[in-house]
């Protein structure tokens, strides 16, 4: 057999595998975990919300991203987050938050620099180990008795210096916007991405659960509250908290949707283009 033919074939094979290895290393992996159904139609649509985010990320980023969506609760396989650049949790929280019994599993990923984003109810965990973990990993959490969860219209005040806001149009959206998070002491290392000023009706607790009022919330009338925030951790990973997305139809708002998609991509370590992640408006 011609030695030159063998040599050329060998070089071609090495080149092929090298190309695919480089390509694989260029792909950013994002894992979504969607919680079990807990509300009526249109609210806490965790499965639908994660699938929408997945499809719109692929629309905007194409082969730059690999996505996995685990539906209806915490994944049961042994190593669900292998090689993930970001984990996005969109699920019911509080005492029944799945992260409470899976802290070590998540910590293993965090310690290697994996990003973590918690959305809506997923920012709520009990005081103690889970609360401290979220403060470390994403900068803060919803603390029962301290935070509040009313339904109100937020008029966006965006931190235009942050990449998550790139290309995002200002918006006015009614949602169950949680606020007064229990952030790290002095809000150390926490960057506000989206703020808004709740009206006094929102602060009254009439639409929150449990019903208000809470003295410290009412007395802060007129104060802007942080609804989306970010951290860049010492381990190299990133964290984001986003308190909206109670109502699925809010993904139909261009500014709201782009902010969320930018946040997911930023959490995974991707560079956000100046116009943000551009996708079509879904019919919801």
Where are these regions (language model features)?
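Positively charged n-region of N-terminal signal peptides that target proteins for export
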Residues: 1-5
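Bacterial N-terminal signal peptides
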Residues: 6-18
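Sec/Tat signal peptide C-region and signal peptidase I cleavage site
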Residues: 19-24
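Helical hinge/lid and interdomain linker segments adjacent to catalytic or ligand-binding clefts
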Residues: 25, 31-33, 38-125
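Extracellular ligand-binding/catalytic regions of CAZymes and related secreted enzymes
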Residues: 25-28, 34, 52-55, 200-202, ...
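A glycine-rich, often tryptophan-bearing local segment used as a flexible ligand/cofactor-contacting loop or short
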Residues: 33, 96-170
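Extracytoplasmic/secreted proteins, especially bacterial periplasmic and envelope-associated proteins
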Residues: 48, 52, 101, 105, ...
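Catalytic beta-strand/loop cores that center a nucleophilic Ser/Cys/Thr
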Residues: 148-235
């Amino acid at each position: 057999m011609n030695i030159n033919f063998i040599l050329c074939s060998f070089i071609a094979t090495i080149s092929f595998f090298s190309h695919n290895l480089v390509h694989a290393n260029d792909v950013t992996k994002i894992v979504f975990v969607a919680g079990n159904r807990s509300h009526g139609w249109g609210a806490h649509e965790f499965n639908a919300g994660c699938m929408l985010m997945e499809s719109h990320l692929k629309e905007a980023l194409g082969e730059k991203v690999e996505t996995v969506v685990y539906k209806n609760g915490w994944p049961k396989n042994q190593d669900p987050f292998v090689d993930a650049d970001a984990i996005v949790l969109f699920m019911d929280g509080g005492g029944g938050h799945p992260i409470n019994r899976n802290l070590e599993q998540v910590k293993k990923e965090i310690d290697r620099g994996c990003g973590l984003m918690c959305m809506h109810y997923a920012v709520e965990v009990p005081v103690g180990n889970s609360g401290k973990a979220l403060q470390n990993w994403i900068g803060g959490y919803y603390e029962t008795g301290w935070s509040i969860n009313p339904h109100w219209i937020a008029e966006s005040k965006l931190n235009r210096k942050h990449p998550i806001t790139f290309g995002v149009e200002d918006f006015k959206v009614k949602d169950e916007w949680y606020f007064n998070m229990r952030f790290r002491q002095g809000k150390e290392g926490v960057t506000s991405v989206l703020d808004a000023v709740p009206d006094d009706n929102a602060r009254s607790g009439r639409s929150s659960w449990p019903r208000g009022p809470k003295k410290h919330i009412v007395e802060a009338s007129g104060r802007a509250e942080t609804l989306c925030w970010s951290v860049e951790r010492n381990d190299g990973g990133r964290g984001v908290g986003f308190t909206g997305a109670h109502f699925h139809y809010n993904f139909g708002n261009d500014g709201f949707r782009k902010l969320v998609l930018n946040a997911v991509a930023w959490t995974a370590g991707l560079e956000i283009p100046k116009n943000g992640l551009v996708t079509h408006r879904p019919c919801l």
